[in-house]
Swiss-Prot record:
Pathway: Amino-acid biosynthesis; L-histidine biosynthesis; L-histidine from 5-phospho-alpha-D-ribose 1-diphosphate: step 6/9. It comes from Desulfosudis oleivorans (strain DSM 6200 / JCM 39069 / Hxd3) (Desulfococcus oleovorans). It holds the Pfam family IGPD. NCBIfam families: PRK00951.2-1, PRK00951.2-4. It is found in: Cytoplasm. This is Imidazoleglycerol-phosphate dehydratase. GO terms for cellular component: cytoplasm.
Amino acid sequence: MKRSASVQRQTAETQVSVTVLLDGIGTQTISTGIPFFNHMLSLFAAHGFFDLTVQASGDIDVDFHHTVEDVGIVLGNSVNKALGDRKGIRRYGYAVTPMDEALAHAVIDLSNRPFLVFNVPSIPAAETGFGVQLAKEFFRAFAVNCGMTLHIRVDYGENEHHVIESVFKAVARALDMATSMDDRITGPLSTKGCI
């Protein structure tokens, strides 16, 4: 069974379309109007082995917030839809990923209980205009709309680009693990009988 989904969202502020294939090879076509965000989403797809298409336009002349948050909403909805009833998935995933001097941890439970813990130090903003707070808004929207509990922690890092990149890579690798199918799991991985 092909685990893929396409979701669109249009508001007065943004227009977003996402297609995701969970069992992909990491191919990506990303266009958000925000170069650094494009880079983060591209490496998210590559390191998670998701085939991902994101087309987004928004009021980035105001700021990046609306576009980044809405991409998180639509990506979360897309992954949630692609997971279906979540039968047979490993459900849990984790990764520790370095990027030069930065080290990020990500732990995921695809529990249908949305929650974000984001323990990432504030770092002076880089020239990209895409800071740690914006990354937090993306992951909050993503976690809530995917129905996942997501814990993110950065132990250390000085360069904001490296910190944010290590986070995106860690989440991608953890999500790849959590969405992976396991032949030993015949239904939802829960004593309740559902996730």
